[in-house]
Amino acid sequence: MSDDTFSRIQSIVEEQLGVESSKIKLETDFQKDLGADSLDVVELIMAFEEEFDINVNDDAAGDIKTVQQVLEYIEAESAK
């Protein structure tokens, strides 16, 4: 895992959802732990796409629930 990638994800989540970065861990679930609704998650996905210059397809977007899943997806896409 890249600490830089995690830090960038953390910053996006902090900015988009208005939560403290200390609450954002790998196992953090956007909806259950941070109170995000489905629109918040869509906006997060769009912010990740822009920040990391990736495209998250609809199937993958529906499966992304935690910070760990975002990180793994970004790393897999970046390796292509």
UniProtKB/Swiss-Prot annotation:
Pathway: Lipid metabolism; fatty acid biosynthesis. Residues 3-78 form the Carrier domain. Keywords: Chloroplast, Fatty acid biosynthesis, Fatty acid metabolism, Lipid biosynthesis, Lipid metabolism, Phosphopantetheine, Phosphoprotein, Plastid. Pfam families: PP-binding. GO terms for cellular component: chloroplast. The keyword Plastid applies. 4'-phosphopantetheine is transferred from CoA to a specific serine of apo-ACP by AcpS. This modification is essential for activity because fatty acids are bound in thioester linkage to the sulfhydryl of the prosthetic group. The modification O-(pantetheine 4'-phosphoryl)serine is found at S38. GO terms for molecular function: acyl binding; acyl carrier activity. InterPro entries: ACP (IPR003231), ACP-like_sf (IPR036736), PP-bd_ACP (IPR009081), Ppantetheine_attach_site (IPR006162). PROSITE patterns: CARRIER, PHOSPHOPANTETHEINE. Belongs to the acyl carrier protein (ACP) family. This is Acyl carrier protein. It comes from Trieres chinensis. The lineage of its organism: Eukaryota, Sar, Stramenopiles, Ochrophyta, Bacillariophyta.
